[in-house]
C-alpha cells in the first residue's frame, strides 16, 4: 500500500474522529479532553512536512480508524447520522476550496489562535470560543448549516455549541487535507475495501 493511501486514510480518520466527538458532545454534553485537544491541534498545523505531523496523538486517531471500518466496512451497523455529518462537511470543504477569500481569512484567524496559545491551553474556553468563531464566521457562511442532533438540554448550552463548532472546524481541516492528498467522494463508494483495509492496518501499527 502506498504512503499516500496511508496518509489519505489518516486524514479521513481525522474527519471521523472529530465527527465522533461532535456526536458524543451533542448527546452527553461533555467530551474527552485529550481527544478534543488532538482534534483542535490538527487545525493549527497548516504547513506539515507529513500528514502524521497533523495527527501527533496517534491514540486519539484510533477512534477515527474504527469508524472508517464501521461506516465503510461490510457490517450492518452503519450510523446514518455520521454519514449525514460527513456528507455536509465534504460539501462545505468544496465550497471553501473555491473561495480564496475564505481561505485567506481562515489562515489569518488561525494565526491569531497561535498567538493566543502563549497564554492559554488549547482546551481553554476562550480558545475554543475562538475556534468556534472561525467556523461560524467563515465556514458556516459558505453553505447550508449542518443540523446537529442530540439532547436539547445540552445543545442549548453555549459551551456545548462552541465545542461542536470548534470540532466541525477540525473536521473541515481534515477534509481539506484529505482532498489535498487526492481524496475524492467516489473513493468512498468504489474504493471502500482498500480504505477499510488501510484503516485496519493502521490500527495495528
From Swiss-Prot:
Pfam families membership: DUF489 (PF04356)
InterPro entries with a match to the protein in the record: HflD, HflD-like_sf
Keyword terms, alphabetized: Cell inner membrane, Cell membrane, Cytoplasm, Membrane
Topology with respect to the bilayer: Peripheral membrane protein
Taxonomy, superkingdom: Bacteria
Cellular location(s): Cytoplasm; Cell inner membrane
Predominant location category: cytoplasm
Membrane-spanning intervals of the chain: none
GO cellular component: cytoplasm; plasma membrane
Matches recorded under PANTHER family: HIGH FREQUENCY LYSOGENIZATION PROTEIN HFLD
UniProt similarity note: Belongs to the HflD family.
NCBIfam families: PRK00218.1-2, PRK00218.1-4
Protein name (record): High frequency lysogenization protein HflD homolog
Organism of origin: Shewanella piezotolerans (strain WP3 / JCM 13877)
Organismal lineage: Bacteria, Pseudomonadati, Pseudomonadota, Gammaproteobacteria, Alteromonadales
Gene (UniProt): hflD
Amino acid at each position: 500500500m502506498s504512503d499516500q493511501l496511508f496518509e489519505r486514510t489518516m486524514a479521513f480518520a481525522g474527519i471521523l474522529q472529530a465527527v465522533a466527538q461532535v456526536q458524543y458532545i451533542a448527546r452527553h454534553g461533555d467530551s474527552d479532553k485529550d481527544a478534543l485537544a488532538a482534534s483542535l491541534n490538527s487545525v493549527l498545523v497548516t504547513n506539515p512536512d507529513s500528514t502524521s505531523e497533523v495527527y501527533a496523538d496517534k491514540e486519539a486517531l484510533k477512534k477515527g480508524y474504527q469508524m472508517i471500518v464501521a461506516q465503510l466496512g461490510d457490517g450492518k451497523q452503519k450510523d446514518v447520522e455520521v454519514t449525514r455529518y460527513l456528507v455536509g462537511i465534504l460539501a462545505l470543504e468544496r465550497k471553501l476550496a473555491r473561495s480564496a477569500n475564505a481561505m485567506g481569512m481562515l489562515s489569518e484567524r488561525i494565526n491569531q489562535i497561535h498567538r493566543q496559545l502563549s497564554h492559554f491551553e488549547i482546551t481553554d474556553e476562550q480558545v475554543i470560543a475562538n475556534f468556534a468563531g472561525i467556523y461560524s464566521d467563515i465556514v458556516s457562511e459558505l453553505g447550508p448549516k449542518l443540523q446537529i442532533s442530540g439532547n436539547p438540554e445540552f445543545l442549548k448550552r453555549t459551551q456545548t455549541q462552541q465545542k461542536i463548532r470548534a470540532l466541525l472546524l477540525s473536521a473541515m481541516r481534515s477534509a481539506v487535507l484529505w482532498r489535498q492528498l487526492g481524496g475524492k467522494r467516489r473513493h468512498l463508494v468504489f474504493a471502500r475495501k482498500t480504505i477499510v483495509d488501510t484503516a485496519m492496518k493502521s490500527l495495528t501499527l
